[in-house]
Amino acid sequence: MSVSRRVIHHGLYFAVLGPLIGVLFLVLYIFFAKEPLVLLVIIQVLPLFLLLSITTGAIPALLTCVMVACLPEKIGSQKNYRCLAGGIGGVVITEIYCAVIVHIKGMASSELFENILSGDSLVVRIIPALLAGVVMSRIITRLPGLDISCPETDSLS
């Protein structure tokens, strides 16, 4: 499969599922690390929480998918190396993205958004990015749409 086809396939899944997986792990982290009552507050504002996670997580997830799709065959074909690269890439790309957003200050106009992007909430950004990168890198080859036949190349062989 060509790199461009892998980028498109991975991009759709990473951008949609990546932030949602991150939210799932973040909610579990808050439930077990903090008081469970905090989870009730999050459930009350879950639509805003999901929107915030997608706005802060879709672009890093998309960039992580491009990185995973462009891995050399030797690394990309082995699950463990692909998961390691996806997890590290997810963390690094998310931190770079958040640093750029904080410096631009264009998107960080609200107090809630600014608190999430501040250095105080490093764990809140790193854990979901790491786990979403690992999980998505692990399951991306099993998701439908990867083995799409192309009529132009099928007729040549």
UniProtKB/Swiss-Prot annotation:
Name by which UniProt lists this protein: Inner membrane protein CbrB
Cytoplasmic-side segments: 1-11, 58-83, 137-157
Keywords: Cell inner membrane, Cell membrane, Membrane, Transmembrane, Transmembrane helix
Localization terms from the record: Cell inner membrane
Keyword Glycoprotein appears in the UniProt entry: no
Major localization listed first in the record, in broad terms: membrane
The keyword Cytoplasm is annotated on this UniProt entry: no
